[in-house]
């Protein structure tokens, strides 16, 4: 799988990625196409397949308390609950910025504590939850794509 920087890519990138064996494209619900051409937006849903046969894996839960305090524990658990109530997989987006302490040790410690609390809350609320990598989720989606179960 791959994710384009800042969620900016176009069809040419998808074609090249497919040629080198990339099956899954990670991103948000909204994709910005190349700024070299007039910027335009495309919208994707979890498990959508493109013309190259690749699947989109859309990030739908966010743990980004360093960037925006409202994107911490409560919001992430709420978004995850919404996904699970709809029988959809949850992909949690987070970045190392939330967990490094070089500049702000308190930030690292607080966010590591909150992320651990989030994982514990998920397991407590959903004891049969499965954690997997993006590639593993992509494999599940691609296997289920042509069955009655749609992601």
Feature-to-residue mapping (PLM):
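Active-site-adjacent pocket scaffolds in enzyme catalytic domains
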Residues: 1-86, 91
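C-terminal domain-boundary segment and adjacent tail
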Residues: 19-40, 91-151
């Amino acid at each position: 799988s791959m994710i384009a920087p800042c969620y900016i890519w176009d069809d040419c990138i998808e074609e090249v990625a497919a040629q080198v064996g990339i099956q899954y494209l990670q991103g948000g619900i909204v994709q910005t196409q190349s700024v070299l051409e007039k910027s335009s937006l495309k919208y994707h849903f979890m498990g959508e397949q493109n013309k190259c046969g690749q699947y989109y894996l859309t990030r739908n839960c966010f743990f980004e308390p360093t960037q925006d305090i409202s994107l911490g524990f409560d919001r992430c658990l709420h978004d995850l609950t919404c996904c699970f109530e709809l029988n959809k997989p949850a992909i949690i987006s987070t970045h190392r910025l939330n967990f490094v302490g070089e500049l702000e040790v308190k930030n690292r410690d607080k966010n590591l504590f909150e992320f651990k609390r989030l994982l514990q809350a998920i397991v407590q609320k959903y004891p049969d939850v499965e954690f997997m990598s993006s590639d593993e989720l992509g494999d599940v989606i691609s296997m289920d794509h042509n069955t009655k179960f749609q992601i």
